[in-house]
Amino acid sequence: MNNFYKNNNNYGYLPFDLKQNHQIPNNAILILDNGDFFLGYNFGSQVTGIGELCFNTSITGYQEIITDPSYSKQIINFTFPHIGNVGTNFEDYESNGSFAAGIVTRQTPTRSSNWRSLNQFDAWLKDLNIPGISGIDTRYITKNIRKSDSTNALIFSSKKNKPNFNELFSLLKEHPSMKGLELSSNVSTKTSYSWNEGVHILLKNFKNKKRKKINSLNIVALDFGIKKNILRNLFDRNVNVVVLPQNSSFEEIMSHKPSGVFLSNGPGDPGATKKETFHLLEKLIKQQLPIFGICIGHQLLAITLGAKTVKMKQGHRGANHPVKNLKSKEVEITSQNHGFVVSKDDLPDDLKITHISLFDKSIEGLEHKSLPIFSVQFHPESSPGPTDSSYLFDKFFDQIIRYHNAKKN
């Protein structure tokens, strides 16, 4: 019998009334916005975490996942039971911290055992102020998410304070849905900076690849919540990379004399993005610059060009998602993390679908029919995940070369 109670079904039994401020025996509780709650064990920080509950099917790469800014305001339910076994390290950060609201796992994290480990998973989460709860039937949670629309959840843990269910549930119900939330401004860099680090090489003790930069080729990357491995892949294509805040002006972008513009991944509802961003993208498109977008960057490009985005029922999150390349007819295994998708309805004639999901046939890639503009919903930089789609960075580089040569002539 599972260690949880469900309001309308006899899935379990609690020998006390949680609504009467009894001490929870397992010291942590996960509450869903439909009233279901699950008892578990705390690890990480003892703070209350509230956010959209989502599930990730990746077997490895939990540090990269948790430090991906796209998980802002989300509680991550890991379907793989063993999380935290190899600890954490300096190389696997995808940002300078984490914006996740909480972590849910089946097994309680054990002490790490790995030659790369520099910190225990539990201690690392405490440093990041992220609450975790273990001992949860994560398969049941995943099925719950798949059956319902988007679900908000709350993690409460304390060895001293007794939970007041009514207060916690009220706090949870007040938390807004992800639909309509603009979050990129919370995770974007506040100042511009240059990036000069290539992809890590495991067999060379993580020393970066030595690349000779072509100083006349500049890429401006707009940061909506950018991952470090995206920047590494861009830098490895022999270009200078400068990262700008998501609210940068057209004049600031053009002052860097870009040969291409990259639109990054990021959290939140793309439709809630400020109008100024879409006006900016319209100006950039008129320059006929090569533009490449990933994740929310893909969605923002699509909206600017006349498409629409919709909230998905359960989203795509994992490192094992099959995508079909409609041009090559090949199947690419991809890393994904999104809860919104570009709608196939009323897709503008100027846009061509280049990739589709083999899970649900949703749009995974778009290309403009006459301009050097393309985008993908998935993550070709992986981290974690396969590198089947890393050729897309080469495609972007080829477009930049053609644009640069055309300007010289």
Predicted regions and their residues:
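RNA-binding accessory domains that recognize and position tRNA/RNA substrates
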Residues: N2-N247, E251, S255-H256, G268, ...
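Short solvent-exposed loop/turn micro-motifs enriched in small/polar/acidic residues
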Residues: N21-I24, H316, P348-D349, L358-F359
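Short clusters of small/polar residues that mark proteolytic maturation junctions
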Residues: N42-F43, F80, Q314, Q336, ...
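Proline-centered loop/turn at the N-terminus of a beta-strand
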Residues: P131, N218, P290-F292, K308, ...
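Active-site glycine-centered loops adjacent to acidic/histidine catalytic or metal-binding residues
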Residues: D137, C295, H338, H379
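Cysteine-nucleophile active-site neighborhood
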Residues: S255, G260-I333, G339-K344, G385-H404
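Catalytic beta-strand/loop cores that center a nucleophilic Ser/Cys/Thr
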Residues: K329-L371, F378, K408-N409
